[in-house]
Amino acid sequence: MLDSKLLRTELDETAEKLARRGFKLDVETLRNLEEQRKSLQVKTEELQAQRNSRSKSIGQAKAKGDHEEADRIMADVANLGSELDEAKAALAELQQQIEDIALSVPNIPDDSVPLGKDENENVEVLRWGTPLAYDFEVKDHVDLGEMADGLDFASAVKISGSRFIVMKGQFARLHRALSQFMLDLHTEEHGYTEMYVPYLVNPDSLFGTGQLPKFGEDLFHTSPLTEQVSDVPLKKLSLIPTAEVPVTNMVRDTITDEADMPLKMTAHTPCFRSEAGSYGRDTRGLIRMHQFDKVELVQITRPEDSMAALEELTGHAEKVLQLLELPYRKVVLCTGDMGFGSRKTYDLEVWVPAQETYREISSCSNMWDFQARRMQARFRRKGEKKPELVHTLNGSGLAVGRTMVAILENFQQADGKIAIPQVLRKYMNGVEFIG
């Protein structure tokens, strides 16, 4: 969430910056609530001071033996206490209203982010590799996978429903090989620490990274199937939409030493998304699934280092595509296409031959102090007593299923077989072709 000071002392300027991303901040409501809050804050402090002053008089009256006066003062103190409780309750309600509004406000775009309404106004900054020209009819990954009996959508529908997949044999092995290759690259060459994390998380974790309260419908939530058998309250958990959630929450409510920064963590996990707003989109194939695997990259940095870290992290995701020899382009998202908590985002889009277009395969974002403020994730500089908020960054390095799509389609042969990229062959026991 944004610094509350921005909504108090720089309200108009903040509204202008948010308008760049198409968000209309309710300035008048916030201004009125803030005026009421200030008034109630003053009233509360005055009542507190009056009650404290009158309370001291009780002992003085008793010391003089004037018990009648002491009783009158005690009655006054009780009345002041009731007024104070009412004022505190009203103040808490006002503060909650202000916080509810603040939680619905997205991050402020960085000045370097291009102005735009939607994905059509994103700006391409780099293109790597050249799409192949095929002398045969290109098949999509669904046809290629079903021809080889490696992708079984029918069984997945029977087991779970639409937007799920069963992979078999060498296709399942290729999926595993991709995950292993990505993890090895990021841990051995890029300096990340591998993490194994829970796939079920509590509401506090989802609040910390910004999925709650605004995006609850995009998640899969669990409900206990059995009756409560102890005094421990049953907690509602949710399946992770991305490893960003558990990995970033590692620093929630902690203070990190400056000497230990940056923290660089990676995790391979399944991800679960309801795709509530994607009805009718990408209904064929592996592009948009309820369950998919992803290797996530997370960095925790000092504020002054985060923009350079975004370039580095994005470069780490790009390296995966380059080693796999997959043509891609890099775009910076415009203000109207940015994620809720992002300050600046790069998307990497891989070439998909059957669609004759580039499709997103990684999104790398600098969240600034937006998540850190929610999580109270801080660090302490050497020689300083007061801790500061960290900056958090995350990105896909990469989405495994979409990387499968790209390999199947870009490396297809005229006979329907798939050539295995050179860097993956050691993970495939030397196999050069599948299908």
Curated annotation (Swiss-Prot):
Under the subunit heading, UniProt states:
Homodimer. The tRNA molecule binds across the dimer.
Reaction(s) this enzyme catalyzes, per UniProt: tRNA(Ser) + L-serine + ATP = L-seryl-tRNA(Ser) + AMP + diphosphate + H(+); tRNA(Sec) + L-serine + ATP = L-seryl-tRNA(Sec) + AMP + diphosphate + H(+)
Q: Which family does it belong to?
A: Belongs to the class-II aminoacyl-tRNA synthetase family. Type-1 seryl-tRNA synthetase subfamily.
Q: What does the entry give for GO biological process?
A: selenocysteine biosynthetic process; seryl-tRNA aminoacylation
Instruction: Please name the top-level EC class of this enzyme.
Output: ligase
Which is an annotated GO molecular function term of this record? ATP binding
Read off the PANTHER family from this record. Answer: SERINE--TRNA LIGASE (PTHR43697:SF1), SERYL-TRNA SYNTHETASE (PTHR43697)
Q: What does the domain comment read?
A: Consists of two distinct domains, a catalytic core and a N-terminal extension that is involved in tRNA binding.
Describe its function: Catalyzes the attachment of serine to tRNA(Ser). Is also able to aminoacylate tRNA(Sec) with serine, to form the misacylated tRNA L-seryl-tRNA(Sec), which will be further converted into selenocysteinyl-tRNA(Sec).
Protein name per its UniProtKB record: Serine--tRNA ligase
Q: Which Pfam families match?
A: Seryl_tRNA_N, tRNA-synt_2b
Its EC number(s): 6.1.1.11
Record-level GO cellular component terms: cytoplasm
Write out the entry's keywords from A to Z.
Answer: Aminoacyl-tRNA synthetase, ATP-binding, Cytoplasm, Ligase, Nucleotide-binding, Protein biosynthesis
